[in-house]
From Swiss-Prot:
Listed transmembrane segments: 32-52, 53-73, 120-140, 153-173, 180-200, 226-246, 248-268, 284-304
Other facts noted in the record for this chain: Carbon 2 of the heme B porphyrin ring is defined according to the Fischer nomenclature.
Name the record gives this protein: Protoheme IX farnesyltransferase
Gene Ontology molecular-function annotations: protoheme IX farnesyltransferase activity
Amino acid sequence: MSVIDTNQIDLAAPRISEAGVADYVALLKPRVMSLVVFTALVGMLLAPGDFHPVLAVTAMLCIAVGGGAAGALNMWYENDIDALMTRTANRPIPRGRVTRPEALTFGMTLSFFSVVTLGVLVNWIAAALLAFTIFFYVVIYTMWLKRSTAQNIVIGGAAGALPPVVAWAAVTGSLAVEPLLLFAIIFFWTPPHFWALALFRNDDYARAGVPMLPVVAGPDHTRLQILLYTIVLVAVAAAPWPLGYFDAVYGIASLALGGWMLVLAIRVYRHRSGSAALRATRNLFKFSILYLFALFSILLIEVVAKAVWQLFA
C-alpha cells in the first residue's frame, strides 16, 4: 500500500495570503497618496473655468486611486528591496500579508479603472497624463532608474510632480504655464527631500543595493547636491511672483519658507559627522515635508479667499 506524503502536498499548495483591508490600504502608500491628492487639489482649484462638483470629485478620486495603484505596483516590483531595508521591511508583501500576484492584480486593476474612468467621465487628456504618470513611476523609475543610476530620484521625481498637471488638465482639457510651475516646484523639491532621507538611511540603501547618491558618490557630495538643489528650489518657487502668476502673499511666504529650508540645507552641508550631522539631515527631511504642504496651502487659501470675496462682492 502506498503512503501519501502530506508534507509534499502542503508544500505544493498555493499560498493563500492573510491580507486584510489595512494591508491593501498600505499597498497604496497612503502618506504619499496624501501628497498626490493635496498637490492635485491645488492644481485643480487654480485652473480657470467652471467645473461641476461631481466631475471634480470624480477627477480627484481617479488621481488618488491612480497614485495609489502606482504605489502598489512599486511594492510588487520592489519586494526584494523592501525585505532588506529596515524602513520598508514591515510592508505587506515582505511580511507575507499580501502575495506578489495579489499586489500586481490589485495595482493593475486600479490603474486601469482610474485611467478609464477619468477618460470617460472627465476628459482623455487628463486620463492620458494620469496613465503616463503611472507608467513613468512604475516602469521608468521603479523598474529602471532606481536600480541603475544615482540620479534615480532626480529623473524619477517627474512622476511625483505630475498630479497638479493632471488635475489642471481635468478642468481645462489643456495645459498652461501655471501647472508647469507647480510641476517645477515639486520636481526641484524632490532631490533635497529624498537625499536627506537617504543620508540617514544610507546603510539601509547600501544593504539593499540601491544606488542612491550617498551610496554611490558619498555623503559629502550628497550634501553639496542638497545645497545646490535647495538654492534652485527657492528660486523656482519664488519665480511665479515676479512673473505675475501668483501674488505677493505667495511670493513673500515662498521666500520665508525657502529661506529657512536653505538654512537647514546649509547646516546639512556644514555638519558632516556625528550627532550634529544626523540631527541636521533629519531636520531638513522633516521640514521639507512641511515646506511643500505650507507652500501649496498658501495657494489653496488664496484661491478660496478670492472665491469667497467674489461671492460677497
